């Protein structure tokens, strides 16, 4: 049975549970659970992670923990009973876990590993806390480490800062806001300190300890590597100050054996010392670690003699130094141990041994020897900081290693009271000794003993250095042969204090012989007592001691024999009569020592001894007291208690005589303890006063003297002694109070009234001193300052003798006596406030009784200072302390009164102060940036204000509001507090991560607003309505709801729950307040329309549904009120749209916001009660329509916002912007917003360097302006100016952008428009400039090369696309050099989630509605709108190139497909063309690089119609070319004509036209298609026409052919006869051919019949210039039948059966084989290698080597564009089928066949032809080609092939040289043929910038020398073919293909562009605006030699689908005329 648990309430999961039982709760190890019930080994409860899910789990899976249960029952809460910091570590680690993993995902690897390390440390520290084995100090230290790491991690992860007190998280409810603010500051500083890793030697920021913290150097000797000494050695280490030239520390001694190891085996790894008590000043000294090496052994190291084994001498060997500054630079952390190597240098001269370390430091290399490489001391150093106890506690391992404490010589900066020292440091300086009759100098050794008064040698009183035990004797080192040795060794003498008096030192001098015996002979001694007769110790000085002669036989047993002798010169003066019969006689030798005493018990000061023994000198007492000031502080603190006892004894002895002197001495000693060096002796003083002071009568004299000093302060000029007495006030009162207590005890409280009276009088004197005007007396000012500083320190002493109220009255009177801030200087202001601050912080102020007395005077002073804006930081500190005390005392009844007092005194002035500070802060940030001081002051006062408001309750607010005398006062107060609150939220006073502080602030604000809103409603509605106050209130509410800290949606769920549990959702609270106040406005709502629409709209952007639901009705209300007032709600509408735009652009709003205004729509429908006030139904309809528009606007704005804030591509951003811009213009007619987005779009184009688009975009704004002088306001970046000026500036900018975009044709009309304006204003300077600009644009058009862009159709399908793209299709203008493959890759990179569709079919609904992204991309061909320019023969191709691809709105692509059964022998019977024409919304180029497709038209072209178009286009091309030669427009050679004729005739002979005959002239076809009779007749007429044209062509060719080319001509005649014969039966009239064609011809039989049909096994390649280019750019096929299907027949290539999917290299190889293989001779006549997967309109002539992975090659007999519909059998072979556009006017790639090789080389003719063509086909950069492919020449030879054995002879050598003649196109049958004199390899937009006028290598015949004149543009003139003259000029030749093609579309209407209409010709009959039409007369009819009359008509050709009605005639001329005119078509 399940029973509720009593004790088992909380536990931790120790084993994961899968919840495999019914109602089982899934648990993971480490989770915590709250247990509700138990039953037989099972628990029922919840996981704290998911508190809403209850379940079962095994009891043995849970580790129970103690917990505190509150509110037992169904809603009980359980808190684990554990250390709060353990709980915090647990929750923090859980929060960090997910964030830590994200760091790795975001590639923040460094922080990832750092955080992992910190998390492991926290886990370990938490484990230590839980162990329960730590001491309190250790627990505190562990907590400190934990908090540092927690704060560090939170800081780096961007989490909230946690305020702490004593390492515990504080509860914001339990402390004042001021304290909370200070804790945040403290936590921030500790985080910054732990993060910054600054130089850790510096004092930490924020340390409040006044004591200097000492440093300590840990030293460890690792090894001494040497091989040359071979003897034992002593190494002494010490710290040396190079600047002072002295040693500052004791020596650390290490004894080493001859191997370099410690002599004592126990010292291994324990040769370490701690150099202690180094001050900050010491660390700045030029310190060195100096090591002196003393060897112990033979006298001479290189002496081979073996001396006596028992005699060892201490001999100097070497020295090493290390700079401490270098150490400090390398030690980056305090506790980092680092190794160093010290090189040991040896001394060259032993006499300079004492200076060797200085010489090494100075690098005096001549005085020491460089060390051997093997010599070196390896040491490690570590720097510590802190007191010794702390170091010992933090580093126990170091102190366990036998650490030698090495102290400073002398006392440290801080002398600790318990530090007992009695050390005498003695230095053996030098000696001067006689030679003693010896020839060499002595080797002197000094031996020293310490002897007691009885002659006993003191044991262990000599220390050579720390680290080794003390000894009883000392032996100096020996300097070889030196009678004036200098030792410089420092010996420490730790003599017990009780043995010091009477002890003396004895120095014995011995000569150490180097002879065999090695004796040490005593020759003298010296001595020195340690204390003088007057009781002082040996002074710290150098002492010269007398040396007395003696020998080894002398005895020192009776020390009295020599102690009576003078030891030194000073002593000699005291012993004038020395008998000469003494045993010891003084020699002339001398010995020098120096001493330094560091003792806390002994003194060297005579004056101090005199004071302590004052009774011995009664007549000198006044002098002794006066000289006390000259005693050093160290001596005074050492004997502090004795001195104080002496002073008070003297005071009791004679008060009147010595009272003032004792008082002054006491003041001196008290002030001495204020020195930081002796600060730690204050406890000694306190202990003395409490336990040892016995002056019961002293208080009387002390009060008297103190009062006398104060009374004299107004008269005396020098007041140094008075100021010292004021500074000593604290301890003087301690003595006074303790003395009075002692007296009261002794007398049972006698003289109490006298004492109280004296204190009263003393305070009167104090008040007198403070009331004096010190503005003119600096001395008095210092006295007052000293008094005020000390005054708060006496409160605790007074409380021992007086009640709290009495002391408070004393203090109030004193503080009240101070002059106001107006009458004192600034420095005194500071001191006064500091005194008040210390008063507030004192224990006295914590009593409510005293606060009631003191608070008014404190508030009075603060109020005055705040009014004057003086010392704001100190005032804020005082207020913070007051609020802190009030908060802690908030349970007391008196607090209500105190808060009331503060509200009356402070609230208003606090608000005013904050407003002033905030305005200054704002101004400073604007000028100088963030100011930390100003920010700190602002934060302090904000926390004070919040503290006060938090303490206020209903009563306080009610009293506050009732106390206002008028509504104006109330209004002023409300405006102030609302303004402060607004600034609080706008200025971000508290940092972002101070979440606790921010939430508390918000809670206080919303509570305060709730109190004040009723006053606002009550006082400022109806007749007293005040817009300013209400507006301020609404603005505050809006700002409050929008605060980032309140947006709970972006924080973790745990944190959100915590906030909601504590505060609730304060946004909802404020929203309800806002709505309520709005409803209270009544008819005054109209005042806030439209002003508050934007702010309220901002509130709806908060992603909180309840807030949105509250706010939406307000908008309906606004619309309703404006409708009532104005009859419409245009203002609401305009403002709503404007604010929506700006806010969403700033990144606000979310996805659910799209549906927000749907809520508003409901208000017009389901709730008719809301419409009762609406009188007309139209209001409802208008409202719904408006909301619908706003909703659509929201969709676009959010799309725009998402594009802009993300890393989206240029196309997306432009598309969003254009979409939004059009919406503003067309749907809601917001011109200003429209113009704003015009400029945004322009900026995007400029950034992407789309200058043409930028110009068109700006042109939209320009068109809105007129040439008027209407003034325009400042807008965007435009200044205030007239409309004329702005339009002029815009025009100039647009012209500049058109120029940069190379779109000069668009810029010229603007130039003309500006010129008209300048001319009308007679501004000739500007007119000159603009005309020059226009002229330069004409030059640029003619001279500069421009690339023709490609165009691509893109379909965006699926719901995942942005709104403006979804399920739409666009045509995009590609970038320069961009082909289809590159464009597709770009689109897929822009939409990485998109899938490229593999077919061109229109997608079905499943794709359109799916949640995915599909892209359908293929290339399309532009259809120019304007054709006049393109039809003119004399217009340069660079001009035409522009009009072919600009101002284009229609595009098309073709798709070949088979309809019906497919004939394997002739596929053209069923091959249809599906032609799609796309019409865009706008022309390209325009304001975007792409526009949406507005309309699409689909037409199917039958096979027969396709054949008609192919033959017709070839006929037009032939006529044009022949006409050029007849008019001698192409002079010199006739290669172009030769190749063109060869291509047509050869293709016809080898199966070209025959295929059409087989397909369409068959009886079966005619029977099955009776409706095609007319078209079949038309095709027959065109074939007949072609025969006639070929006949004329051959006649012209015969006339001009070079003799060497006669074999070719003969071959053409023969093949022509075969062609005519093959068509004889169909066209009976063909047997009557002109003599020119038949004279020399012999029929060869029906070649067509024997020719194998074109099958898939043969190579079939699509020619890119097929006649189906007719509607687009007029491209023609290379033979009459070379394109049964249009070259536009699709955008995918079709391959034959066997060539399907071949790589381009394979195709190329296949074609070469076809030309070399006799099987293919004559059949492969029209070969062109297609471009690759992006074979596109601008494929260049180099595209033959480009791959075609996405294309299919059709089985057509000649070039067709492939179909996107691949035959089923091939679908598997190509996964990617991209629709490609047809090629526009580009020369195709040519591939010349290598027919017959002459000795491995091509025949002469082909060799020459290759040179000619290659010259014209320079390598260029085709964007379709890869880099590897761009290096190849790709030649296109359309059906130019010579049968075997019929090769013409080679051209003469002279014809191979270069000639400036016209080039030929890459293909002899290319659409530019002979007329295109300017035929370009790049054709306008080819990529390499090669000139469009390619060179030709064709030479002239020998009869006609080559011309050197260049092409010109003179008008053409008639020329008779019979004349054998050169033409009088060389005309410019342009492609006939354009006029032929564009005739078909000439009649199509021209679309007006967004640019001015004069950019392009409007009427085809008028001259085009750019450029002007050249003179273009009609050509007269030309008579052919053979009588054939050819007539050129200027009329346009027939359309695509036309009926032919002319029957064939019987007369040849009529046939020729009819054939010639057959190109005229009907529209």
Swiss-Prot record:
**Gene Ontology MF term list:** GTPase activator activity; guanyl-nucleotide exchange factor activity; SH3 domain binding
Localization of this protein: Cytoplasm
Stretches of Basic and acidic residues bias are at 1981-1998, 2011-2027
> What family does the entry list?
Belongs to the DOCK family.
* Effect of gene knockout: DOCK3 knockout mice show sensorimotor impairment and structural changes in several brain regions, including the spinal cord and cerebellum. Structural changes are consistent with central axonal dystrophy and include a disorganized cytoskeletons, and abnormal accumulation of autophagic vacuoles associated with impaired axonal transport. Common features of mutant mice are gait abnormalities, limb weakness, ataxia, and an impaired ability to swim.
What is the designated name of this protein?
Answer: Dedicator of cytokinesis protein 3
The record comments on the domains as follows: The DOCKER domain may mediate some GEF activity.
The task this protein performs is described as:
Potential guanine nucleotide exchange factor (GEF). GEF proteins activate some small GTPases by exchanging bound GDP for free GTP. Its interaction with presenilin proteins as well as its ability to stimulate Tau/MAPT phosphorylation suggest that it may be involved in Alzheimer disease. Ectopic expression in nerve cells decreases the secretion of amyloid-beta APBA1 protein and lowers the rate of cell-substratum adhesion, suggesting that it may affect the function of some small GTPase involved in the regulation of actin cytoskeleton or cell adhesion receptors.
Query: Where would you say this protein principally sits, based on its record?
Result: cytoplasm
Quaternary structure, per UniProt, is: Interacts with presenilin proteins PSEN1 and PSEN2. Interacts with CRK.
Q: Motif SH3-binding at which residues?
A: 1967-1973
- Which residue ranges are recorded for the region named Disordered? 1672-1695, 1731-1768, 1846-1925, 1971-2027
Tissue localization of expression is: Expressed in brain, spinal cord, pituitary gland, testis. Not expressed in heart, liver, kidney, spleen and lung. In brain, it is highly expressed in the cerebral cortex and hippocampus, while it is absent in other tissues, except in spinal cord. In the cerebral cortex, it is found within the intermediate (III and IV) and deep (V and VI) layers, whereas it is weakly expressed in superficial layer I. It is also abundant in the piriform cortex. Within the hippocampus, it is expressed in the pyramidal neurons of the CA1, CA2, and CA3 regions and the dentate gyrus.
Q: Which CDD domains match?
A: C2_Dock-B, DHR2_DOCK3, SH3_DOCK3_B
Which parts of the sequence belong to the DOCKER domain? Answer: 1225-1632
Organism of derivation: Mus musculus (Mouse)
Residue ranges annotated for the SH3 domain, each copy included: 6-67
Give the modified residues of type Phosphoserine. Answer: 1655
Give one GO biological process term. Answer: small GTPase-mediated signal transduction
Compositionally skewed regions (Low complexity) per UniProt: 1676-1695, 1731-1751, 1877-1899
């Amino acid at each position: 049975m399940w029973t509720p648990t009593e004790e088992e309430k909380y536990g931790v999961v120790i084993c994961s549970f899968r919840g495999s039982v019914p109602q089982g709760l899934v648990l993971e190890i480490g989770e915590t659970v709250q247990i509700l019930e138990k039953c037989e080994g099972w628990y029922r409860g919840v996981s704290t992670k998911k508190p809403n899910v209850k379940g079962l789990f095994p009891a043995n899976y849970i580790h129970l923990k103690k917990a505190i249960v509150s509110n037992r029952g169904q809603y009980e809460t359980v808190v684990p009973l554990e250390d709060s910091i353990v709980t915090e570590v647990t929750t923090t680690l859980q929060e960090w876990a997910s964030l830590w993993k994200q760091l790795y995902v975001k590639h923040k690897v460094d922080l990832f590993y750092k955080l992992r390390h910190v998390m492991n440390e926290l886990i370990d520290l938490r484990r230590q806390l839980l162990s329960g084995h730590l001491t309190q100090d250790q627990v505190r230290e562990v907590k400190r480490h934990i908090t540092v790491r927690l704060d560090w991690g939170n800081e780096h992860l961007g989490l909230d800062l946690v305020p702490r007190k004593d390492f515990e998280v504080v509860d914001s409810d339990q402390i004042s806001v001021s304290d909370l603010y200070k804790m945040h500051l403290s936590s921030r500083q500790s985080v910054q300190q732990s993060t910054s890793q600054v130089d850790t030697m510096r004092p930490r920021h924020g340390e409040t300890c006044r004591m200097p913290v000492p440093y300590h150097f840990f030293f460890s000797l690792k090894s001494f590597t040497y091989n040359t000494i071979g003897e034992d050695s002593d190494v002494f280490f010490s710290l040396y100050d190079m600047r002072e030239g002295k040693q500052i520390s004791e020596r650390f001694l290490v004894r080493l054996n001859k191997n370099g190891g410690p002599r004592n085996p126990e010292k291994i790894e324990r040769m370490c010392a701690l150099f202690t008590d180094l001050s900050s000043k010491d660390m700045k000294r030029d310190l060195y670690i100096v090591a002196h090496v003393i060897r112990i052994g033979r006298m001479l190291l290189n002496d081979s003699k073996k001396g006596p084994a028992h005699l060892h001498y201490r001999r100097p060997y070497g020295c090493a130094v290390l700079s401490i500054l270098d150490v400090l630079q390398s030690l980056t952390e305090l506790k980092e141990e680092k190794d160093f190597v010290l090189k040991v240098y040896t001394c060259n001269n032993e006499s300079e041994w004492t200076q060797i370390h200085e010489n090494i430091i100075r690098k005096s290399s001549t005085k020491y020897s460089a060390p051997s490489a093997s010599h070196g001391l390896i040491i490690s150093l570590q720097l510590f900081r802190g007191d010794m106890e702390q170091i010992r506690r933090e580093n126990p391992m170091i102190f366990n290693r036998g650490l030698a404490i090495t102290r400073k010589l002398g006392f440290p900066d801080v002398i600790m009271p318990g530090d007992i020292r009695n050390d005498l440091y003695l230095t053996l300086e030098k000696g001067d000794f006689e030679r003693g009759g010896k020839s060499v100098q002595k080797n002197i050794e000094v031996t020293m003993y310490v002897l007691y008064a009885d002659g006993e040698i003191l044991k262990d009183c000599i220390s050579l250095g720390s680290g080794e035990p003390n000894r009883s004797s000392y032996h100096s080192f020996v300097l070889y042969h030196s009678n004036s040795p200098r030792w410089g060794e420092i010996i420490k003498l730790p003599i017990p204090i009780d043995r010091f008096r009477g002890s003396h030192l004895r120095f014995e001098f011995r000569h150490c012989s180097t002879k065999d015996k090695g004796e040490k002979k005593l020759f003298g001694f010296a001595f020195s007592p340690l204390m003088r007769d007057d009781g002082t110790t040996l002074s710290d000085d150098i002492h010269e001691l007398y040396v007395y002669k003696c020998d080894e036989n002398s005895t020192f047993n009776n020390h009295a024999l020599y102690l009576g002798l003078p030891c030194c010169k000073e002593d000699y003066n005291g012993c004038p009569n020395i008998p000469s019969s003494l045993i010891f006689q003084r020699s002339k030798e001398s010995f020098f020592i120096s001493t330094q005493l560091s003792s806390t018990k002994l003194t060297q000061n005579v004056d101090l001894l005199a004071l302590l023994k004052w009774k011995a000198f009664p007549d000198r007492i006044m002098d002794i007291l006066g000289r006390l000031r000259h005693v050093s502080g160290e001596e005074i603190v050492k004997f502090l208690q004795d001195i104080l006892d002496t002073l008070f004894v003297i005071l009791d002895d004679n008060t009147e005589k010595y009272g003032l002197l004792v008082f002054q001495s006491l003041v001196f000693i008290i002030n001495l303890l204020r020195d930081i060096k002796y600060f730690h002796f204050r406890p000694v003083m306190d202990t003395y006063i409490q336990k040892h002071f016995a002056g019961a009568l002293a208080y009387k004299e002390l009060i008297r003297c103190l009062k006398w000093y104060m009374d004299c302060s107004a008269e005396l000029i020098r007041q140094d002694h008075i100021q010292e007495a004021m500074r000593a006030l604290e301890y003087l009162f301690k003595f006074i109070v303790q003395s009075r207590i002692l007296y009261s005890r002794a007398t049972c409280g006698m003289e109490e009234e006298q004492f109280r009276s004296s204190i009263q009088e003393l305070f009167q004197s104090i008040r007198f001193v403070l009331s004096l005007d010190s503005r003119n007396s600096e001395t008095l000012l210092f006295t007052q300052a000293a008094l005020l500083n000390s005054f708060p320190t006496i409160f605790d002493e007074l409380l021992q003798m007086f009640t709290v109220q009495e002391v408070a009255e004393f203090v109030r009177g004193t503080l009240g006596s101070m002059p106001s801030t107006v009458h004192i200087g600034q420095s005194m202001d500071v001191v006064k406030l500091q005194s008040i601050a210390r008063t507030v912080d004192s224990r006295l102020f914590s009593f409510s009784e005293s606060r009631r007395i003191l608070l008014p005077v404190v508030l009075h002073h603060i109020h005055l200072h705040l009014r004057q804006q003086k010392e704001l930081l100190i005032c804020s500190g005082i207020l913070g302390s007051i609020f802190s005390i009030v908060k802690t005392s908030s349970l007391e009844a008196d607090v209500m009164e105190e808060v009331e007092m503060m509200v009356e005194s402070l609230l208003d002035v606090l608000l005013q102060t904050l407003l002033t500070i905030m305005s200054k802060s704002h101004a400073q940030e604007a000028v100088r940036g963030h100011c930390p001081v100003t920010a700190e002051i602002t934060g302090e006062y904000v926390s004070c204000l919040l503290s006060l408001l938090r303490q206020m309750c209903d009563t306080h607010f009610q009293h506050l509001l009732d106390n206002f005398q008028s509504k104006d006062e109330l209004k002023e107060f409300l405006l102030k507090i609302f303004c402060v609150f607004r600034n609080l939220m706008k200025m971000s006073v508290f940092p972002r991560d101070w979440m606790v502080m921010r939430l508390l602030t918000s809670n206080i604000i919303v509570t305060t607003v709730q109190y004040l809103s009723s006053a606002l409603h009550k006082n400022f509605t109806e007749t007293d309505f005040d817009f300013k106050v209400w507006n301020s209130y609404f603005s505050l509410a809006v700002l409050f709801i929008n605060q980032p800290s309140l947006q709970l949606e972006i924080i973790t769920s745990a944190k959100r729950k915590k906030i909601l549990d504590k505060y609730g959702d304060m946004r909802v609270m404020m929203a309800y307040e806002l709505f309520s106040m709005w409803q209270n406005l009544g008819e005054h709502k109209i005042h806030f329309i439209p002003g508050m629409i934007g702010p309220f709209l901002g509130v709806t952007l908060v992603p909180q549904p309840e807030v949105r639901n509250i706010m939406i009705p307000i908008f309906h209300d606004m619309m309703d009120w404006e409708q009532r007032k104005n009859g419409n709600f245009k203002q609401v509408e305009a403002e709503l749209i404007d604010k929506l735009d700006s806010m969403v652009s700033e990144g606000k709003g979310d996805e659910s916001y799209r549906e927000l205004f749907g809520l508003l729509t409901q208000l017009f429908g389901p709730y008719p009660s809301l419409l009762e006030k609406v009188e007309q139904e139209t209001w409802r309809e208008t409202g719904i329509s408006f909301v619908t528009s706003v909703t659509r606007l929201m969709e676009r704005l959010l799309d725009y916002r998402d594009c802009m804030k993300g890393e989206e591509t240029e196309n997306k951003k432009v598309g969003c912007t254009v979409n939004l811009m059009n919406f503003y213009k067309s749907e809601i007619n917001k011109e200003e917003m429209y113009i704003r987005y015009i400029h945004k779009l322009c900026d995007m184009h400029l950034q992407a360097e789309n200058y043409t688009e930028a110009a068109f975009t700006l042109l939209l704004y320009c068109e809105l302006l007129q040439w008027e002088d209407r003034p325009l306001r400042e807008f965007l970046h435009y200044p205030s100016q007239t409309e004329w000026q702005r339009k002029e500036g815009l025009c100039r900018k647009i012209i500049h952008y058109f120029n940069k975009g190379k779109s000069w044709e668009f810029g010229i009309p603007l130039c003309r428009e500006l010129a008209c304006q300048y001319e009308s204003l007679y501004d000739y300077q500007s007119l000159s400039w603009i005309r020059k600009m226009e002229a330069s644009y004409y030059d640029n058009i003619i001279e500069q090369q421009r690339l023709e862009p490609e165009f691509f159709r893109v379909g965006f399908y699926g719901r995942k696309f942005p709104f403006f793209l979804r399920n739409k299709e666009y045509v995009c203008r590609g970038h320069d050099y961009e082909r289809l493959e590159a464009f597709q890759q770009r689109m897929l990179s822009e939409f990485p989630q998109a899938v490229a569709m593999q077919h061109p079919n229109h997608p079905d609904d499943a794709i359109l509605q799916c949640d995915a992204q599909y892209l359908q991309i293929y290339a399309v061909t532009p259809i120019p709108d304007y054709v006049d320019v393109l039809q003119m023969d004399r217009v340069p191709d660079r001009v035409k190139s522009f009009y072919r691809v600009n101002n284009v709105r229609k595009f098309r692509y073709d798709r070949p497909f088979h309809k019906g059964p497919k004939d394997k022998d002739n596929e053209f019977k069923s091959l249809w063309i599906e032609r799609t024409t796309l019409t865009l919304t706008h022309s390209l180029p325009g304001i975007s690089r792409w526009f949406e497709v507005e309309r699409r038209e689909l037409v199917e072209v039958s096979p027969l119609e396709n054949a008609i178009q192919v033959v017709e286009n070839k006929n037009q091309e032939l006529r044009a070319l022949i006409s050029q030669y007849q008019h001698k427009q192409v002079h010199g050679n006739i290669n172009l004509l030769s190749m063109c004729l060869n291509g047509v005739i050869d293709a016809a002979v080898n199966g070209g036209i025959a295929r059409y005959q087989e397909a369409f002239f068959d009886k079966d076809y005619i029977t099955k298609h009776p409706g095609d009779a007319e078209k079949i007749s038309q095709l027959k007429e065109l074939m007949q026409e072609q025969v006639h044209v070929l006949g004329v062509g051959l006649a012209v060719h015969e006339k001009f052919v070079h003799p060497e080319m006669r074999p070719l001509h003969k071959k053409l005649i023969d093949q022509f006869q075969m062609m005519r014969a093959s068509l004889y039966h169909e066209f009976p009239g063909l047997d009557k051919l002109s003599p020119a064609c038949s004279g020399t011809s012999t029929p060869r039989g029906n070649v067509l019949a024997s020719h194998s049909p074109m099958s898939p096994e043969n190579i079939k390649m699509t020619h890119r210039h097929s006649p189906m280019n007719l509607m687009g750019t007029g491209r023609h096929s290379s033979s009459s039948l070379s394109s049964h299907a249009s070259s536009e027949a699709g955008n995918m290539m079709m391959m034959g059966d066997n060539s399907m999917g071949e790589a381009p290299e394979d195709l190329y190889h296949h074609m070469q084989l076809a030309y070399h293989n006799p099987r293919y001779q004559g059949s492969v006549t029209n070969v062109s290698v297609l471009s690759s997967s992006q074979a596109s309109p601008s494929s260049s002539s180099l595209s033959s080597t480009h791959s075609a992975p996405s294309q299919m090659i059709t089985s057509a007999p000649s070039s067709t564009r492939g179909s996107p519909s691949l035959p089923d059998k091939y679908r598997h072979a190509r996964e990617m089928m991209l629709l490609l556009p047809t090629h526009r006017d580009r020369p195709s790639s040519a591939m010349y066949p290598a027919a017959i090789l002459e000795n491995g080389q091509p025949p002469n003719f082909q060799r020459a032809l290759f040179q000619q063509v290659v010259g014209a086909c320079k390598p260029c950069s085709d964007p379709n080609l890869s880099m590897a492919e761009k290096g190849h020449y790709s030649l296109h030879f359309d059906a130019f092939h010579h049968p075997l054995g019929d090769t013409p002879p080679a051209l003469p050598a002279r014809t191979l040289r270069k000639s400036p003649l016209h080039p030929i196109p890459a293909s002899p049958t290319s659409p530019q043929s002979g007329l295109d004199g300017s035929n370009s390899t790049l054709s306008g937009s080819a990529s390499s910038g090669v000139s469009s006028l390619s060179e030709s290598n064709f030479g002239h015949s020998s009869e006609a020398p080559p011309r050197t004149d260049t092409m010109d543009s003179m008008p053409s003139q008639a020329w008779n073919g019979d004349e054998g003259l050169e033409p009088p000029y060389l005309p410019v030749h342009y492609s006939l293909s354009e006029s032929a093609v564009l005739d078909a579309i000439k009649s199509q209407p021209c679309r007006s562009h967004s640019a001015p209409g004069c950019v392009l010709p409007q009427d085809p009959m008028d001259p085009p605006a750019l450029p002007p039409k050249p003179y273009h007369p009609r050509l007269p009819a030309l008579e052919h030699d053979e009588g054939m009359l050819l007539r050129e008509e200027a009329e346009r050709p027939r359309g695509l689908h036309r009926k032919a009605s002319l029957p064939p005639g019987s007369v040849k001329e009529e046939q020729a005329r009819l054939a010639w005119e057959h190109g005229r078509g009907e529209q």
